[in-house]
Amino acid sequence: MPKAPKKITKPKKAEKKKNPLFQAKPRSFRVGGDIQPKRDLTRFVRWPRYITLQRQKRVLLQRLKVPPQIHQFTKTLDKNQSSNLFKLLASYAPEKPAEKKQRLVAQAEAKKDGKQVETKKPIVLKYGLNHITTLIENKQAKLVVIAHDVDPIELVIFLPQLCRKNDVPFAFVKGKAALGKLVNKKTATAVALTEVRNEDKAKLQQFSELFKTNYNANDELRKTWGGGILGQKSQHKVEALAKAVQEEQIKKAKL
């Protein structure tokens, strides 16, 4: 008799060992399920230390009452005025080391050839707090520009009053780094112009009048206190308390 055919057996697949630490969790794709809408999580970000300090300082200056002498530093020139001012100041930036080397080499070669070398004192921006203070006291400065974010503020807090006393036009601009860039430094507390070229005298006069109107002769700037703004939570508490008092008064009036 013929033998019965052998049963075809499928080879058993080796079961993969599953790690018990990783468990399958089915996701719900409904509204408000596992996939949440994007939210602004700025408040919960762990910022770098220096940014945290910047944020805390900003909030503190809003909460506390800030004296006018410090608060006036927040009243900077607007974007249009400051851009025009920086264009003028950039044309009087001191020479860079490479430019100085090139100039000295050219002078040395001219001297070697027996040519007469003319050396005129260049008209450049003045910087350095002590130097600017001396220029203001001697009434040599025609225009003074002060950075609004000097830290500690005590370094320059006397400059505005000194400028008013000596009738020197001054203004606050955003960024000690921007002023530093003009004089080839990382930062600068203030810069000053003592003289300008003939073609820029009209611009200097224009800026002098603007600064005197907005800063030197502006008495509100010297009297206005800053800060004293409550936070969102405190504002809600004050409103709730005022509402409760109002309701209590209405009840008493009805009695």
From Swiss-Prot:
It comes from the Eukaryota. One of its GO terms (cellular component) is ribosome. GO terms for biological process: ribosome biogenesis. PROSITE patterns: RIBOSOMAL_L7AE (PS01082). Residues 1-16 have a biased composition (Basic residues). Keywords: Ribonucleoprotein, Ribosomal protein. Residues 1-28 are annotated as: Disordered. Gene3D superfamilies: 3.30.1330.30. GO terms for molecular function: RNA binding. Belongs to the eukaryotic ribosomal protein eL8 family. This is Large ribosomal subunit protein eL8. The gene is RPL7A.
